[in-house]
């Protein structure tokens, strides 16, 4: 069983990683092709392409200029500790023990606009390139065309090598669109997290993102290898709702009074 997650725009570059173990991204040669093109963009072009402020555009122009291989612990950081958004706050990998971190390495993959598909302990350098960015490149008009089936093929290889036939999708639609589900050789499960508000259950973005990370933490803390055991997920008041679920979409609900 493997989980896939989205990356985060917010990065933690300052705090040292709590573990020394690391791996290298499998698709770094592809990343280098993208970065060569990104380096050609002036800050104003980055601002327009990514719809960000001049300050953020300048920061990322500097990141692009400084991006260089090979990656080492001195010039890069493991992805699971670099990403710092809602999902990763829910996962809180910094407080997992080494055995649980290794569980993440063996069961979790992170989708990325620049790096394609990452293991949690893959070293990365800071960047900003969301998968949905309309970045024209050598292979097409956007990143979905750049990556084509590369991410899907690597996922299939990863699943086959592990003898696994289940992929749990905890990524956003923007990122999971980079996976060709028609060519994916795995059973696909998509957990959905709903919160009660004014008597009705709905997906609330902040809670849903955070809970995706919480589910991965739950799996690591309980060393889960059987997908069915995920139905026991109960962190922060969520409960599996069998009636609202089907074979591929598993719905977890939390009532208002539990928050």
From Swiss-Prot:
- What's the source species for this entry? Neisseria meningitidis serogroup C (strain 053442)
Family stated for the protein in its record = Belongs to the UPF0246 family.
SS bond partners: none
What high-level taxonomic lineage is stated for the organism?
A: Bacteria, Pseudomonadati, Pseudomonadota, Betaproteobacteria, Neisseriales
One Gene Ontology cellular component annotation held by this UniProt entry: cytosol
The UniProt entry, under InterPro entries, shows: YaaA (IPR005583)
Q: What protein am I looking at?
A: UPF0246 protein NMCC_0856
- Which BP terms does GO give this entry? response to hydroperoxide
HAMAP family reported in the protein's UniProt record: UPF0246 (MF_00652)
A Pfam family of this chain: H2O2_YaaD
């Amino acid at each position: 069983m493997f989980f896939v997650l989205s990356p985060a725009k917010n990065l933690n570059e300052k705090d040292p990683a709590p573990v020394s173990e690391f791996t290298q991204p499998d698709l770094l040669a592809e990343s280098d092709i993208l970065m060569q093109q990104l380096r050609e963009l002036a800050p104003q072009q980055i601002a327009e392409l990514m719809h960000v402020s001049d300050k953020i555009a300048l920061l990322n122009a500097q990141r692009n200029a400084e991006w260089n291989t090979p990656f080492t612990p001195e010039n890069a950081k493991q992805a699971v500790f670099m990403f710092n958004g809602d999902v990763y706050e829910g996962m809180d990998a910094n407080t997992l023990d080494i055995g649980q971190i290794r569980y993440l390495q063996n069961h979790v993959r992170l989708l990325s606009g620049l790096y394609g598909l990452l293991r949690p302990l893959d070293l990365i350098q800071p960047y900003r390139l969301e998968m949905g960015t309309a970045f024209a490149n050598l292979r097409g008009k956007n990143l979905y065309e750049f990556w084509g089936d590369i991410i899907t093929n690597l996922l299939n290889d990863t699943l086959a090598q592990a003898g696994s036939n289940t992929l749990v999708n905890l990524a956003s639609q923007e990122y999971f669109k980079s996976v060709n589900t028609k060519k994916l050789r795995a059973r696909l499960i998509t957990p959905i997290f709903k919160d009660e508000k004014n008597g009705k259950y709905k997906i609330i973005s902040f809670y849903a993102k955070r809970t995706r990370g919480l589910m991965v933490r739950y799996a690591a803390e309980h060393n889960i290898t059987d997908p069915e055991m995920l139905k026991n997920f109960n962190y922060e008041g969520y409960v599996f709702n069998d009636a609202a679920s089907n074979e591929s979409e598993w719905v977890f609900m939390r009532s208002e009074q539990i928050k």
